[in-house]
Amino acid sequence: MSANIKPLIKEDFKHSFSSASKFVKNPSEWICHYGLGLRSPSNAAMTRGNLAEFGTYYKIKRGMNGKDGKAFSKLIEHRFKKLKFLNADNEIKNAIDIAVHFEKILYERQLRDIKSYQREEIKKVEGLKYPVRMFTDFEFENLIVDAKSTLRLPSTPKIDHIRQQGLYSKLYEKPTALMYATPKKSLFYELTDDDVNIGFNEALNHFKSLENYIIRCNNSLEEAIKITPLYTDPNPFAWDHNIKQEAEKIWQKVMKK
């Protein structure tokens, strides 16, 4: 590739489940995020999840089950201020309540010895050019649990979530489960063998589709933009206003060439 042609991805690119999902749902949004580096700011849901998962980890590691919640509440408030989350103060109470549910779910299943928390793992996968990067929430001796904080509890696990944990189960060679919680309700689901096999194969196909797309563009950012319509409809992605404006300018500039 010529030195004056900006690549779509760098040589050290690594697959991730979120990257592939973004590409499948909206290739132009994927280009903005990974090719152009236009990243959306942290939102309220991300803040809630970060605080709830950290709170759960802390409570279990410190053996705080059933103890006075005042110290725990202060811990969450301190972390909120330390990380300088913006416009999400109301998520502090939600995160505290959700963490209590997460902790209860894990304790009821005798899951108390956390082997790792938010551990990064990078693995080569047969049939893929690029390795796969993974982050687990809670890893126990014989189970990986992915925590999902939400304000509306799903009646059944979301397909994307099952697909991701199917991928992780195969690559970690360990059973996986999904743990959902709102401030008032919770849901725990252990993946079946069929979930794992189907989820892994679907995720693998998404990775391969992305690699074929990169080949088709000759790893050229400009070529990728030329063959990919810019789709900024609120669904399936809520676009940040500044990113939307910047993306529109870039697409118009490339299309005029």
Report residues per predicted region.
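Metal-dependent nuclease catalytic cores that hydrolyze phosphodiester bonds in DNA/RNA
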Residues: 1-135, 247, 255
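Residue-level recognition of conserved beta-strand positions in structured domain cores
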Residues: 34, 146-149, 180
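A generic structural signal for short coil/turn motifs at secondary-structure boundaries
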Residues: 40-42, 152-156, 188
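Flexible, glycine- and charge-enriched loops at secondary-structure boundaries
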Residues: 45, 154-158, 193-196, 200
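Short active-site loop/helix that positions an aromatic residue
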Residues: 61, 170-171
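Glutamine-centric residue-chemistry signal
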Residues: 118, 164-166
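Non-catalytic protein-protein interaction segments used by genome-maintenance enzymes to assemble
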Residues: 123-164, 171
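Metal-dependent nuclease catalytic regions and adjoining charged, substrate-binding loops involved
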Residues: 172-257
